[in-house]
Amino acid sequence: MGDDAVNSTAVQFNRDAILKELNDKGYCVIPDVLTSDECDVYIGKYRDWLATFGEDEAPFQRHSIIQSYRVGHLEPTWEVRLKAKSVFQTIWQTDKLLSSVDGIAIAEPPEKKSQEFHTPNTNWFHLDQSAMRVGFHGYQGAVYLEEASENDYCFRVLVGSPKLYESFYDRDEIEAEAKKSNELGHYMLSNNDVAWYHQHGCYPRKVPVPKGGMVVWDARLVHDNCRPEEGRPNKDRWRFVVFVCMTPARWARKKDLQLKREAYEKLMMTSHWPSQGIALKKKRLAHLEEEHRIEKLPGVARSHEAKLLAGVEEYDFEDGRPNGPDWEPQWSEL
């Protein structure tokens, strides 16, 4: 697993090691969040869902990321989300958290149907934190149900880029109108933007993640993913990833909680953000979505813990137990 993996006790005990990695590089790989057997069970459930599609209806989407079909509410997605909670609980030092209802990533091997491989010198680098958010706002995460080596479908980052977040958005080249259009969404970098980061010492690095591991990153980190490389050793390796983000529940405002309840009750997807600046995902695929989506929440999503994470049930912030950091994220007006 190399230098990018923190010892497996990190989930419970090594918070300092996780935070050091996040501060130094902007990301951290944590192994053994799930066991191999757990991963195989969840993969099996996703394969059962995939089997409901016809040959020409497969839900594989651009960059392997699926944010439709209510996938954020599928049983295995909620099960993985609950398993990943311990990581965020370690980071935030509280179990009073809210979760995004985020997407998943599934991709079949490109060797299977002569599909596209990675093209050198291409990228879709982006920031998931807009200029409206000042400074640090949270950590994103992705749980890997299958191993991803550097030549597989692999997460890629500009190392250290969170430290340049304010400087990047303060440039004259970034127009205020462009910032406004991305108040809650992400910013797609141009070639000139990427060159600017390179000039400031931030270079691309692929980040391998072991099966059952999780990569956590500062939301100010510039990142994308790369398609598998042609001639890779593991020609039959799929991609199965579940995206999870959790932040302290005490940060949420009334309007945020209203949107979270709507997402839960209507089985809607949300953006990456769990506590502030919630955005609901709109339907994208009309008839296909209706045919292959679930119509009611699975049992695991109706548990007390899941309802707390979804913002449907309320935490007791006066019970004497830790509520998380005593500061709140800052916002700007453009």
Regions found by a protein language model. Name each.
Residues 173, 211-216, 220-334:
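Non-heme Fe(II)/2-oxoglutarate
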Residues 130-150, 208-211, 245-248:
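Short, conserved beta-strand element in jelly-roll/cupin
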Residues 115-118, 123, 151-160, 166-170, ...:
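A short secondary-structure junction signal
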Residues 138, 148-222:
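Double-stranded beta-helix
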Residues 2-24, 31-132:
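Non-heme Fe(II)-dependent double-stranded beta-helix
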Residues 27, 101, 136-142, 152-154, ...:
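Extracellular structured ligand-interaction cores
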Residues 106-109, 158-166, 245-251:
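Short edge-strand/loop segments of extracellular domains
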Residues 89-98, 131-135, 144-152, 164:
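Secondary-structure boundary elements
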